[in-house]
């Protein structure tokens, strides 16, 4: 997850580029998996804008989400992985197969609390796009953005609003 001040929160990595600017966040949670808690408004009175990292283009943002008083967690296959014989193996494991799921590159879940969003981002990743989004749609307190294996973005219906911006 990238923040408007170019702060990247990636899996297992937290770098502050403009340290003092981050003090504007009313709350902040620096979990190991790309977790954020945003509260209040920025210094201009606007909603915070959180950027979702492009899982295949380091340093680029694939979508921007305007958020207020919420928690955000992202799970992906792009930080903790290795490639062997052309197959990407990563730290998220499907318990049914014992393998790393390959249909999704990244899942960002938005909800009321960070513990839930962190757990659900991993669940949706393992479930895949179709079943994962069905699950999210059945939970009125959650929204999600999924980047599939083809780089396509899938949004829950709660995020299909005019303020959502994506890379073309």
Model-derived segments and their meaning:
Residues 4-17, 21-25:
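Alpha-helix boundary/capping motif
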């Amino acid at each position: 997850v990238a923040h408007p001040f170019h702060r990247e929160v990636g899996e297992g990595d937290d770098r502050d580029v403009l340290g003092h600017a981050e003090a504007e966040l009313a709350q902040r949670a620096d979990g190991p998996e790309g977790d954020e808690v945003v509260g209040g408004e920025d210094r201009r009175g606007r909603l915070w804008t959180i950027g979702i990292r492009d899982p295949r283009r380091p340093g680029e943002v694939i979508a921007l989400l305007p958020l207020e008083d919420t928690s955000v967690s992202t799970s992906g296959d792009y930080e903790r992985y290795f490639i062997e014989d052309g197959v990407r193996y990563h730290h998220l494991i499907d318990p049914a197969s014992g393998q790393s799921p390959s249909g999704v590159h990244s899942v960002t879940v938005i909800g009321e609390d960070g513990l839930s969003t962190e757990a659900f981002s991993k669940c949706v990743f393992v479930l895949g796009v179709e079943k994962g989004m069905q699950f999210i749609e059945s939970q009125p307190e959650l929204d999600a953005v999924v980047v599939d294996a083809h780089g396509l973005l899938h949004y829950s219906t709660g995020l299909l609003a005019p303020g959502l911006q994506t890379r073309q």
